[in-house]
């Protein structure tokens, strides 16, 4: 398995968008639309996990996430792994790749917004806040010092 950056203008962009659109996650249509329409800052990135040239998972590294009126940044978001590959530490590899990228940019901490309990803690994230996201659903905000 290999983790690669996927930029909107590279050869894997369409493959990534097709993977997102066809995935089982209920957020996938929103994520695909946002990724296609988003005006990326120079340092923001999307990472994809590849197995034999097939995308099996993804995450993004962005300035903002789905919770308004907070000063936290940057975020690792949209972490998803195909069901067939769960349990193989793909999400951990995606998150660690995003963290290494954040370090290379000089960031000292990263954040994740999630409703999952006891998931990101195993990767060293600590819940620091709770906020309602754009649909009004309460989400935890997790931080990891890097």
Predicted regions and their residues:
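Conserved acetyl-CoA-binding loop-helix of GNAT-fold acetyltransferases
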Residues: 81, 87-100, 112
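Short loop/turn motifs at secondary-structure junctions and domain boundaries
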Residues: 37-43
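Conserved beta-strand in the GNAT
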Residues: 48, 54-64, 75, 80
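Short amphipathic alpha-helix that is part of the acyltransferase structural core
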Residues: 1-34, 50
